[in-house]
Amino acid sequence: MARTPSSEAHEKVLEAAIQLIGERGIEGASMDAIARLAGVSKATVYNHWKDKDALCVDVVNRLRVAPPEFRSGDPKRDLLSLLTHLAQANRSARMHKLLPRIVGYAAANPRFAEAMKRNSLGPIESQILRILDEGVSQGVLPASMDLQTGLLLLLGPIMYCRMTRGKVPPNLAAEVLERFWGKWP
């Protein structure tokens, strides 16, 4: 199927945004500069995205790998599968270069942070919370466990390694899960 001029412009803008954000950060990548690099008008950019935050959310969505749904019925196995997927996904050099810039921008821009959480992190968080809730329902995790704290304990080490090192040690997902699971009687 042939691409339309509009879809070609969309792709060019996304690629230009990825390049400029990687070089300058989100604050330094103006919509004018993105349009110039993409070879389109600024109006074309705004026809596809209402603002730079919306464009940046699409940039992240373009580079991330959405996790599959894990539903084996065994919460520990599902968590290991999901955490392993997250540890191994998005190892591209482009994502490694962009991630600290995106997180820094999100820290200073609550509206962007909320859009990122809803569009990019939300599905991951929802799946972890669902699996933890299944563990509580099955009695393999305590009813008193705070699910949000569990989410942070499981996801934090992987995200930290991804941000600071660009890669996650191969055994980290299993180690984090074993320590988390071992905490509960």
Where are these regions (language model features)?
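Short amphipathic alpha-helical segment with a characteristic S/N-K-E followed by hydrophobic residues
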Residues: V13, G28, D51-C56, A66-P67, ...
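Basic, helix-initiating cap at the start of DNA-binding domains
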Residues: M1-R24, G28-L37, A54
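Short hydrophobic/aromatic patch on the recognition helix
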Residues: A38-W49
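C-terminal peripheral helix-coil segments that are non-catalytic and often amphipathic
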Residues: S81, A87-Q88, S126, R130-S137, ...
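Tryptophan-centric aromatic hotspots in well-structured domains and transmembrane helices
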Residues: H48-W49, M116, S120, L155, ...
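Hydrophobic alpha-helical connector segments
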Residues: P67-L99, G150
